[in-house]
Amino acid sequence: FITYALFSKLENEDQLAGVLGHEIGHVIGRHSAERMAKQGLTQSIVSGVAVGIDPSTAQGAAAIANTLNMKYGRGDELESDDLGVKFMMDAGYNPAELIGVMKILKEAAGPNRTPERLSSHPDPENRIEKIKEAIEKYRK
């Protein structure tokens, strides 16, 4: 999905195409279904660990599970960025404009943004590098 806040900051149709291509990438990659399955699995493991163990150990297991789920989320975001680049190129849009979207997201997050390791989304700078790699990959 796209929020009005992001939509209002987009500078051109190519950037909108990039956001929509990214979101279609989530659908094609079945990321929602995979994330729900992974969260269910880690929740089951944490519940099993929590039985008969002190609360602090259970909290530690929950924190580890949460970190693992965020790592999977970051991978999904990078895969969707990659697919978004491909879809943009296939449709005749300028894929470099997806980099502009990442700059908008970086600016919106400000200097106190959540560290990547604690976020479900990769840092915009890392995403920019991966987008550049995807552009080169699909130009060949």
Predicted feature locations:
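A Zn2+-metalloprotease active-site environment signal
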Residues: 1-140
